Amino acid sequence: MKKYIFLLIILAATIFTSFTDCKKDEVNNIENEHEIPIDIEKPDVVIKPIQMWIDAHANLSRFSQKSSITSYLKKMKETGFNEVYVDVKPGIGYALYDSDILPPLTKWGDETVERDWDYLAYWIEEAERLDMKVIASLSVLGYGYTKTKEGLVYEDDRWNGKTQKEMPDSSRPDLVVDMRDQTNVDAVMLNPAIPEVQIFILSIIEEIATKYPQLKGICLDYCRWYGGRYGFGNATISAFEAYSGVTVNNNNQIITRIGGIGPLYKHWIEFRSMTITNFITNIRSKVKAINPDLELHLWASADWRSRYIVGQNWASKKYKPTGSSSIYTDSYNKTGFADQIDVFSLGAYTDKIWIKEDPNSVWTVENFVTTYSDFTRGDCDVHGSFASYAYGNDQEKISDAVYLCLKNTDGLMVFDISHVINHNQWDAIGDGINRVYKK
């Protein structure tokens, strides 16, 4: 009997011990579930597009050799850039790519550069090797250089009557001056209200998009009227009459003899903006038909309230301006083109960085990069851009401008590499980038 009792005690002890061990394992497993792992996998930081602009005129000789392109692309990469805008059809109207439509750009003023290689193709090739992207930029409507009378519009009678014309003195409304005869403008610009002009430019964009499928995008620059008094030739007035249904008997119906706002002014403003927007829409259709993944970019001044003068309503169609009923029609919002571009390069080109420097003005980098969404309403990506020449050797300002643009928008563009080189701004740009990514 005692033997059986002893065996029962041993069995009970074994069961209890096993039960206790199971409970300990269960507790340990629960505790292990809540242990903090030693190696935490951090989420990937999304690096925004950080772009350098390569102006054709300022860098014509600098990039006459392949070795220079390679060297500076490496410098850009080391600084933090991952994309580059390459100006391939500047305002003189010649090509820096392999074109069957435009003459090659070999001479500009006193500079002469001969190449037996494809300029744009080499930028793309070297950028790809460094895991960088290229966007081809072009002066959309610029086709002549007034200071030396060089360019397409000076060589071909085809463009007679198709350039923009200025009414310089509203007290003499019948006097209009062809841009080709002026010397104080950046470029002679073709008239976007003329169908032949649009067809010609579309063919150039089609050529670039077709020949260079490796491009990330195409950027439109100078896609506008040159200024508020440009566009008063017969061709534009006729197009305005057809658009608005009004008859213009005198240009002073648009701008008065003393330079004020005439009774047709706001209708004129809508027409000019709609002309540009329809043109951009046509460009988008052409680009996307060739390559749906090819991005359409556009650069314009960040000061939206002054852009009506040149027909650039870069806002969303959802944005309706308030006030200024003498400037904007009730339907002006339909001229917004933010939904027709993929990327808007927001030109915050001003010497003031912080709002506190000039609190009563919109003209600060900080203001522009923190208020743009009021206008674009999310219709496109926006990259803050600044003019590096405005800050010279002031390293702090350069770093601040980079920081504000990159921190507050979808990307950054620095204009332009010639000023970055001349003022040795590389370290300051790198510092601004690192402030955003806290390296």
Task: Go through each PLM region and give its residues.
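Substrate-binding cleft of secreted/luminal carbohydrate-active enzymes
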Residues: I327-K439
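Bacterial Sec-dependent N-terminal signal peptides
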Residues: T14-V45
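Aromatic-lined carbohydrate-binding/catalytic grooves of carbohydrate-active enzymes
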Residues: T79-R115
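Active-site-adjacent "subsite" loops/lids of carbohydrate-active enzymes
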Residues: K42-F63, A136, L141-T210, I258-Y265
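Aromatic- and acidic-residue-enriched segments that line the glycan-binding/catalytic groove
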Residues: L96-W108, G142-Q182, L220-R257, I309-K320
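The substrate-binding groove and active-site-proximal loops of carbohydrate-active enzymes
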Residues: I54-F63, I101-D116, N184-L202, G262-T277, ...
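Catalytic domains of carbohydrate-active enzymes, especially glycoside hydrolases
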Residues: S67-Y94, P213-K216, K334-L346, N408-L412
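Substrate-binding cleft/loops of secretory-pathway carbohydrate-active enzymes
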Residues: Y143-T146, C219, G228-R229, I290, ...
